[in-house]
């Protein structure tokens, strides 16, 4: 290989290497980060036990939401789904963007009535769902639901 060919080869190699770095740098610069979506837009004065909503990249995780008032399973389920909808929208998502849903029932006998309210709440393509009956839901709620959605 003569001097001219080597220079041409080395010049092309340097250009390819520079292009590779240029492509890799934006990927590193745009790495996802954890964002806590605080109620009211600012962190509380004291460190809370848990966060109500956290996003990572375009994934959004909502902690379990219950209903803490007297009522039947239908009223509790409707309230919880309304709260989920409000929280999703405040974080830039929506019910039809929910990917995964966990439902915790205080009593399995409420399964059918909960489903009557739940049906259609997430649009025509509902998320995957797991439903379990648990020994107790905090705050005497008959149902608690948490979701994972995308933004």
Regions found by a protein language model. Name each.
Residues 2-78, 89, 106-151:
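N-terminal presequence-like segments and the immediate start of the first folded domain
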Residues 84:
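Residue-level signal for inorganic ion chemistry
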Residues 87-96:
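Phosphate/pyrophosphate-binding loops at sites that engage ATP/ADP/AMP, CoA/4′-phosphopantetheine
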